UniProtKB/Swiss-Prot annotation:
The gene is rpb1. GO terms for biological process: 7-methylguanosine mRNA capping; co-transcriptional lncRNA 3' end processing, cleavage and polyadenylation pathway; intracellular phosphate ion homeostasis; termination of RNA polymerase II transcription; transcription by RNA polymerase II; transcription elongation by RNA polymerase II; transcription initiation at RNA polymerase II promoter. This is DNA-directed RNA polymerase II subunit rpb1. It comes from the Eukaryota. Sequence repeats lie at residues 1558-1564, 1578-1584, 1585-1591, 1592-1598, 1599-1605, 1606-1612, 1613-1619, 1620-1626, 1627-1633, 1634-1640, 1641-1647, 1648-1654, 1655-1661, 1662-1668, 1669-1675, 1676-1682, 1683-1689, 1690-1696, 1697-1703, 1704-1710, 1711-1717, 1718-1724, 1725-1731, 1732-1738, 1739-1745, 1746-1752.
Length: 1752
């Protein structure tokens, strides 16, 4: 597996903390060089040995096995290669720095090297404010480039002018030289100087040689370098000019020998040889004194070779070619691009320990298993270190060798030496030593990462457990294919084997499939039941599906963890039958409740629609995709949230196995018969299609006879098309519906559609009824040639069949024309998909690169690698998206009256409350005050919701902790009866709730910002809690008692804390994936608005690209203009505003323009106009009369369109007035009145006084001039409206608003939508509601309303695009993207122009795009990269500071010292003590005394590496796999006294692995009698213990550390307590009383049973052989046959005993579990002595005086 074996390096490895960029100085190049290269040849004369001083000089390192390196003396494998150098005869420009060289030249005086400006210039001081050196250089350059002279201080001729010390001179102190303007031409720089005062002279122009530039740069002073943003230490400007060229070692430009004689050299070697030759030519010419132009030519050649050696893709330069004509691969080409060094070899590499093959489905594997072919299992290995615990196993594997499956391939000794077992003669005899490593084959149960490309989201790589199987494909469970987006038509997938325990731990704890069931993308499951299991489970759960006894018995075999009890049959006579629902109920875990009403009906549901599951029993409903699919709030989601990932996995496995077994015997197949509808239906279909054709024909007739009215905002053609499409789609749907109704329910296609496993209504209608209209580019099939679609049809045929309507079904078959049209539509789909894949792939990459380093920090904020705050709280609530789900705010939908009825309590008037309560609270004014206060708060909450948070009345929002479910669970667990009054007081409820709210912390801290953020984050959840736990609801609706209420409070707090996002979570990448993944599902095309088809809106991928690129000019810019309420309600008023806004130019209303020669201004040659011209001049006007002679004889005549004038509500005087306004006195205008036959405007030019009318020469110009005026008038004279807004459409929008009584109602309002944008002016139009008006170009919003408005506009636009096709992405991902784009105060595009202009590290930027340019820039400004980002650490091969790498581990050295003493090498390896299976309830591994060394029991992964070990943590198929690890096992030292998780199935709906541990001192648990998570006085031998009793919990109130069966997980036991110590005198592993071999304790003794829930090896009264014993039987009692835990007559000590009775006491008469003075935290509580208290200062597990056995 491993490539070349390098000998281990002796160099100590350290972490790269930062990377400094810079330019190599000539001195450095010479000093690190080992050889001066002078000859272009590689080999000496013999052709066998490398030539000294040649390009393969032996000092540079060897690439030949025969030679050793002359510098370091190593062989080819170990010599890293050494640099040489070439001394250039003349300096040359470095091509990467050429533009920078030009900039610097323009900043300094080219004569004395001084900066052209200094601090006397105010602009200069501004430039020095830039922190970033690159920006500073640009700023200085902008100021300097215009200065054309170097200012002097004192004139150079004066006596005290000091040449040696320029800074001593006053003023600027320059040299006064004129500065050239510099032009770059190819690889050369030209300077041109202005010649003195005489402007007529041409400027002097000459070439600036690199040598001159080099000289200037050496003169620049240190201060000036700093001002210029250059770095004196790492990147002086004179080093940008190459004087010495480094020669890379041969190992980076290896040559290949062809047939032993000739060698093929690398491109770089060829290039270097060209440089050496050119260099020699320049040197020769110089020595010979050749003419200047020849030397210059050779210098240019040298410059060209050096430039193309580095970059062979210079614009405007010929490429350097190989002899074959292939361009050479330059250094730049090696680095850039996808295949280049950075992206191809550093950011992503090919890896070892991976396998790839085809995948196949296997429903019998567990959800997280992966079937691996045996050949792969024998090839891939895992290095396991030899320890006392596995030495025998590993020895066995070594014995098996590399060819037998569970074997081993290599042994690695502690010296690092590898033994290959394939070639070792007696491999089996090698004795293993501790500390050696064995590379063993992978075997069942190993975890691996499985992946399918393209990896679009984190569920594309998940952890699986392997199972080695025969044959050559990977096998995986069907349900896991959906997140991978895999199918079994030949897909291949990759498997990666982790190579360290740390990696395996991360895979197990973070990436395992069950943990990925619910995705953060849309907070819903990504896996559900699919395919045949889904079709089967629907059939299986139908009401009329019965099973016989035999069938049920066989099925029971497949039910996981079946307890051996059959559910009672539903039918007893004539024969015993069970239903499928009963069997499914066995698989659903107990404690799961689900309700879904499809149609609001009574509970006795005749149609069996909807779904009701109570306590894991299906009451009614058919199980289909809605229930067991990957749906929000479905069964999978509920089980995962309530019971944890492992149980959820068990549910998947169980349902698949049971249903597939049943389906195997029941059968389900589909044939062509299932698509055939009956004859009547076919007649109906034919009739429907005929009718549609008739309607279309009618439509065509209407259009041809001009009877069709165009719809608003559409042309006639568009209206016609829209109408035809409507008719045809209607026809297809109707035909399909009739076909669907005719198919029976037993029809197999219909069954699949009903189950949701495959197919939809449209598939049925296309197969059986009619395929329907084919669409290309959103329209019907267009006319391709000569006005028709195909030669089969007449010209201009618009009939359905000609334009692509297919009236046949797939069953009947398509005609050739139909087939052709169908192929057209299909082809479009394929092309679309192909184009879309490339586009979205690039979008995804850009998103990830823009957000890869955004992470949740340990202070709860979201920051990027530079530590800039992006969000104060992740998603503004600081929660993990996987752990939130949609919840409804009850108070929002109620009317004010209903609200009052539900929440208000008035003790004086309403007496009903007291009926529900034990204690009377009537007439208690303090209680009433509390209640009033609560009600005021609830009203305020409701106000806030209605006004600000959900003004549209949508009452659903994703929130943590499903409160409703917790209440339901409580009602079940505590068996609360509706009739019993409660012992809760209103004050208890209100105080309990307030305490809970105070504990919901996401941020700890008391400063103002923290408090604000904390309050904002939890506000919605607080409102939800207050509305759910209002006093009236708790007492009257849920009827909770005190215990239940306190349990609920504790549960809510615990679950809320789990829902808080983990620090180190890489939320940026998650957000990028959550947006990129739906983008791949998006359709590329833009769609039309329904109804108004000319209102085109860009959607889908093109719109997403516009948003991410922050495009200035978007395809369809549009404003949504909302109107004032009174206008929005009235169509006519809205129409007025529309005309106000729509931009109307003169050309819009003009129907014709003419130019006439009409010399007499007072009369006219045009007959039509005579009347109004005469009428105009009939009334004399002195001013007009005076100026008559100035009027031009040429006349411009405009004719206006009356219909348009009326539509736009314009009058003639309006139009003429605008013209006059525009031209003022230069144009003379007269016009006809508004009701004349024709609307005419006549214009003449008024000439200046000096141009008299007789001047004929100007006549010619005048008509031409008039023509230009005409064009100008039509376009630029704006009659009314807002510029840029070309069209305005009126739309009716549905809005939701709150009305008087507090409910929400739907209403319509008129809204204007525009083509074109101009937000500023549109907002000022009268009647426009400026607060709601919106532009879809957020670039415009940024300019007008600022960055915060832009952020919400951006969010809205993103939402529109993603939710258009029904995807849902959780708010926090979109919000994070918007915040990243706007957090810098300007819009950062998700392109190289945005991402690469941020201040992130150079390495990170160069891994995105513009690789070489960024590295050059970094070098030139001497940047430093602090390696905080993700990309940098990936390149350097280091653990990046993210996730599990975001923190360090703090190790308690002393504890370690004490601990290691007890480790004894186990002797009983594998003596029959396998991992015992305990029932979920038993938290204690009862079968061993705490002092025995645990030996080989239980796999380490069972005791998960944290104090949270608890029932069912790591089991297979939902059993608890208890790692029974004894005293000295390394996994047990972590149990601190306050840390026992109370979760286990006896009590709480238990949370599985992710549960935080409650501390016993949590007030929410203190007074519950049945819930003493860690009270230290319970003994399992006490007669009151019963596994099924409601008050029993493995962690229950009476557990005693001194009892013989006391276990290591007990809170008071801690290995660090001094009295327990392997060296303490009272403990001895060999003492006779504690020995595995002692007679009283033996694993094989008849009294030992690891599965018994209450087994204690020393209890005399318990025996598994006792006749009445059955652990699951409710009436089981170890001592008495009549014992029943719930019967009041049972009593261990007294006749009146009842477990909840206040006088019941295990130890003393005055002890009462519910009495307020009893609490594990109360100081007076003590199990053994009055002075004991867990929180008292004297109690501490590590305190020397504390001992579990000492009395105090």
């Amino acid at each position: 597996m491993s490539g070349i074996q390098f000998s281990p390096s002796s160099v100590p490895l350290r972490r790269v903390e930062e990377v400094q960029f810079g330019i190599l100085s000539p001195e450095e190049i010479r000093s690190m060089s080992v050889a001066k290269i002078e000859f272009p040849e590689t080999m000496d004369e013999s052709g066998q040995r490398p030539r000294v001083g040649g390009l393969l000089d032996p000092r540079l390192g060897t690439i030949d096995r025969q030679f050793k390196c002359q510098t370091c003396g190593e062989t080819m494998a170990d010599c890293p290669g050494h640099f040489g150098h070439i001394e250039l005869a003349k300096p040359v420009f470095h091509i990467g720095f050429l533009s920078k060289i030009k900039k610097i030249l323009e900043c300094v005086c080219w004569n004395c090297g001084k900066l052209k400006i200094d601090s006397s210039n105010p602009k200069f001081n501004d430039t020095q404010r830039y922190r970033d050196p690159k920006n500073r250089l640009n700023a200085v350059w902008n100021v300097c480039k215009t200065k054309m002279v170097c200012d002097t201080g004192l004139s150079a001729g004066s006596d005290n002018f000091d040449l040696s010390n320029p800074s001593a001179n006053m003023g600027h102190g320059g040299c006064g030289a004129a500065q050239p303007t510099i032009r770059k031409d190819g690889l050369r720089l030209w300077g041109s100087w202005k010649r003195g005062k005489d402007e007529s002279d041409l400027p002097e122009k000459r070439l600036l040689s690199p040598l001159e530039v080099h000289t200037i740069f050496t003169h620049i002073s240190s201060e000036d370098l700093a001002h210029l943003g250059l770095n004196e230490q790492y990147a002086r400007p004179d080093w940008m000019i190459i004087t010495v060229l480094p020669v890379p070692p041969p190992s980076v430009r290896p040559s290949i020998s062809v047939d032993g004689t000739s060698r093929g050299e690398d491109d770089l070697t060829h290039k270097l040889s060209d440089i050496i030759k050119a260099n020699a030519n320049v040197r020769r010419c110089e020595q010979e004194g050749a003419p200047a132009h020849i030397v210059s030519e050779y210098e240019q050649l040298l410059q060209f070779h050096v430039a193309t050696y580095m970059d062979n893709e210079i614009a405007g330069q010929p490429q350097a070619l190989q002899k074959s004509g292939r361009p050479l691969k330059s250094i730049r080409a090696r680095l850039k691009g996808k295949e280049g060094r950075l992206r191809g070899n550093l950011m992503g590499k090919r890896v070892d320990f991976s396998a790839r093959t085809v995948i196949t489905g296997d429903p019998n594997l567990s959800l997280d298993e992966l079937g691996v072919p045996r050949s792969i299992a024998k090839t891939l290995t895992y290095p396991e270190t030899v320890t006392p615990y596995n030495i025998y196993q590993l020895q066995e594997l070594v014995r098996n060798g590399p060819d037998e499956h569970p074997g081993a391939k290599y042994i690695i000794r502690d010296t690092g030496e590898r033994i290959d077992l394939r070639y070792h003669k007696r491999a089996g005899d090698i004795p293993l030593r501790y500390g050696w490593r064995v590379e063993r084959h992978i075997r069942d149960g190993d975890v691996v990462i499985f992946n399918r490309q393209p990896s679009l989201h984190k569920m594309s790589m998940m952890g699986h457990r392997i199972r080695v199987m025969p044959y050559s494909t990977f096998r995986l469970n069907l349900s896991v294919t959906s997140p991978y987006n895999a199918d079994f038509d030949g897909d291949e997938m990759n498997m990666h084997v982790p190579q360290s325990e740390e990696t395996r731990a991360e895979i197990q704890e973070i990436t395992m499939v069950p943990k990925q069931i619910v995705s953060p993308q849309s907070n819903k499951p990504v896996m559900g039941i699919v395919q045949d299991t889904l079709a089967g489970v629907r059939k299986f759960s139908l009401r009329d599906n019965f099973l016989t006894r035999n069938a049920v018995m066989n099925i029971m075999l497949w039910v996981p963890d079946w307890d051996g009890i059959l559910p009672p049959p539903v039918i007893l006579k004539p024969k015993v039958l069970w239903t499928g629902k009963q069997i499914l109920s066995l698989i659903i875990p107990k404690g799961i409740n689900l309700i879904r009403d499809d149609d609001k009906q009574s509970l006795s549901n005749p149609t069996d629609s909807g779904m009701l599951i109570e306590n894991g029993e299906i009451i009614y409903g058919v199980v289909d995709k809605k229930t067991v699919g990957a749906s929000q709030g479905g069964l999978v989601h509920t089980i995962w949230k309530e019971k944890g990932p492992e149980i959820c996995k068990g549910f998947f496995n169980g349902i698949q196995r049971v249903v597939n077994y049943w389906l195997l015997h029941n059968g389900f197949s589909i044939g062509i018969g299932d698509t055939i509808a009956d004859a009547d239906t076919m007649k109906e279909v034919t009739r429907t299609v005929k009718e549609a054709r008739r309607q279309v024909a009618e439509c065509i007739q209407d259009a041809q006879h001009n009877r069709l009215k165009p719809e608003p905002g559409m042309t006639l053609r568009e209206s016609f098309e829209a109408k035809v499409s409507r008719i045809l789609n209607q026809a297809r749907d109707n035909a399909g519906r009739s076909a669907e109704h005719s198919l029976k329910d037993s029809n197999n296609v219909k069954q699949m559609v009903a189950a949701g496993s495959k197919g939809s209504f449209i598939n049925i209608s296309q197969m059986s009824a009619c395929v329907g209209q084919q669409i290309v580019e959103g329209k019907r099939i267009p006319f391709g040639f000569k006005y028709r679609t195909l030669p089969h049809f007449p010209k201009d045929d618009d009939s359905p069949e000609s334009r692509g309507f297919i009236e046949n079904s797939y069953l009947r078959g398509l005609t050739p024309q139909e087939f052709f049209f169908h192929a057209m539509a299909g082809r479009e789909g394929l092309i679309d998909t192909a184009v879309k894949t490339a586009e979205t792939g690039y979008i995804q990459r850009r998103l990830v690169k823009a957000m890869e380093d955004v992470m949740v920090r340990y202070d709860g904020t979201v920051r990027n690698a530079m530590g800039d705050i992006i969000q104060f709280a992740y998603g503004e609530d600081g929660l993990d998206a996987t752990l939130v789900e949609y919840q409804v705010f009850d108070s929002l939908r109620l009317s004010t009256k209903q609200f009052e009825k539900k929440y208000r309590i008035d003790l004086m008037e309403d007496r009903s409350l007291s009926l529900y309560m034990e204690n009377s609270i009537e007439n208690d004014s303090s209680v009433q005050d509390l209640l009033d206060e609560e009600y005021t708060q609830l009203v305020a909450d409701r106000e806030l919701l209605c006004k600000f948070i959900f003004p549209k009345g949508d009452a659903r929002w994703p929130l943590p902790v499903n409160v409703q479910r917790i209440i339901q669970n409580a009602l079940q667990i505590f068996h609360l009866e509706a009739k019993k009054p409660t012992d809760l007081l209103p004050s208890d409820i209100i105080n309990g709730l307030n305490e809970l709210i105070a504990k919901l912390t996401i941020f700890r801290g008391s400063d103002r910002i923290t408090r604000d953020v904390q309050n904002n984050a939890t506000l919605l959840f607080q409102i939800l809690l207050r509305s759910k736990f209002a006093v009236k609801r708790v007492i009257m609706e849920y009827r909770l008692n005190k215990v239940a209420f306190e349990w609920i409070m504790g549960e809510v707090e615990a679950r809320f804390q789990q829902a808080v996002v983990s620090p180190g979570e890489m939320v940026g990448t998650l957000a990028a994936q959550s947006i990129g993944e739906p983008a791949t599902q998006m359709t590329l095309n833009t769609f039309h608005y329904a109804g108004v088809s000319s209102k085109n809106v860009t959607l889908g991928v093109p719109r997403l690209k516009e948003i991410l690129n922050v495009a200035k000019n978007i395809k369809t810019p549009s404003l949504t203009i909302y109107l004032m309420p009174w206008i929005a309600a009235n169509m006519d008023l809205a129409k007025n505003v529309q005309t106000q806004i729509e931009h109307t130019t003169l050309s819009t209303v003009t129907s014709a323009t003419e130019i006439h020669y009409d010399p007499d201004p007072q009369d006219t040659v045009i007959e039509e106009d005579k009347d109004f011209v005469e009428a105009f001049f009939a009334i004399p006007d002195e001013e007009v009369e005076e100026n008559l002679y100035k009027q031009s004889p040429w006349l411009l005549r405009l004719e206006l369109d009356r219909a348009k004038m009326l539509d736009k509500k314009l009058s003639m005087s309006d139009v003429a007035g605008k013209i006059a306004e525009s031209f003022e006195r230069d144009l003379f205008t007269i016009w006809s009145e508004d009701n004349a036959d024709k609307l005419i405007i006549r214009c003449r030019i008024i000439r200046d006084d000096d141009r008299k009318a007789e001047d004929d020469d100007n006549m010619i110009e005048e008509d031409v001039f008039l023509k230009t005026i005409e064009g100008h008038m039509l376009e630029s004279i704006s009659l009314r409206g807002v510029p840029n807004i070309t069209r305005v459409y009126m739309m009716e929008h549905k809005i939701v608003r709150q009305i008087e009584d507090g409910t929400f109602e739907r209403a319509d309002e008129w809204v204007l939508e525009t083509d074109g944008i101009n937000l500023t002016e549109a907002m000022t139009v009268e009647g426009v509601d400026a607060t709601r008006t919106y532009s879809n170009s957020f670039v415009e919003i940024l300019q007008i309303l600022g960055i915060e408005a832009t952020r919400s506009a951006l969010l809205k636009e993103l939402r529109n695009v993603i939710e258009f096709d029904g995807s849902y992405v959780n708010y926090r991902h979109l919000a994070l993207l918007c915040d990243v784009m706007t957090s810098r105060g300007h819009l950062m595009a998700i392109t190289r122009h945005g991402i690469n202009r941020a201040e992130t590290g150079a390495l990170m930027r160069c891994s995105f795009e513009e690789t070489v340019e960024i590295l050059m820039d970094a070098a030139a400004s001497g940047e430093k990269d602090d390696c905080k980002g993700i990309s940098e650490n990936i390149m350097l091969g280091q653990l990046a500071p993210m996730g599990t790498g975001a923190f360090d581990i703090y190790l308690d050295q002393d504890m370690l010292m004490n601990y290691s003493l007890g480790t004894a090498v186990p002797t009983l390896a594998g003596s029959g003590m396998g991992t015992s299976q305990l029932p979920e309830g038993a938290g204690t591994p009862y079968e061993r005394s705490p002092m025995v060394d645990s030996g080989f029991v239980g796999s380490p992964d069972a005791a998960a590496f944290s104090p949270l070990v608890q029932g069912g943590s790591e089991g297979r198929e939902g059993f608890g796999d208890y790692g029974l690890l004894g005293a000295a096992s390394p996994y047990k030292g972590v149990q601190s006294p306050g840390y026992t998780s109370p979760f286990s199935s006896a009590m709480s709906p238990g949370y599985g692995l992710t549960s935080p541990s409650y501390s016993p001192s949590s007030p929410g648990y203190s007074t519950s009698p049945a819930y003493m998570p860690s009270s230290p006085s319970y003994s399992p031998t006490s007669p009151s213990y019963s596994p099924t009793s409601p008050s029993y919990s493995p962690t229950s109130p009476s557990y005693s550390p001194t009892s013989p069966s006391y276990s290591a997980t007990s809170p008071s036991y801690s290995p660090t307590s001094p009295s327990y110590s392997p060296t303490s005198p009272s403990y001895s592993p060999t003492s006779p009383s504690y020995s595995p071999t002692s007679p009283s304790y033996s694993p094989t003794s008849p009294s030992y049973s690891p599965t018994s829930p209450s087994y204690s090896p020393t209890s005399p009264s318990y025996s598994p052989t006792s006749p009445s014993y059955s652990p699951t039987s409710p009436s089981y009692s170890p001592t008495s046959p009549s014992y029943s835990p719930t019967s009041p007559s049972y009593s261990p000590t007294s006749p009146s005993y009842s477990p909840t009775s206040p006088s019941y006491s295990p130890t003393s008469p005055s002890y009462s579990p519910t009495s307020p003075s009893y609490s594990p935290t109360s100081p007076s509580y003590s199990p053994t002595s009055p002075s004991y208290s867990p929180t008292s200062p004297s109690y501490s597990p590590t305190s020397p005086s504390y001992s579990p056995t000492s009395p105090s």
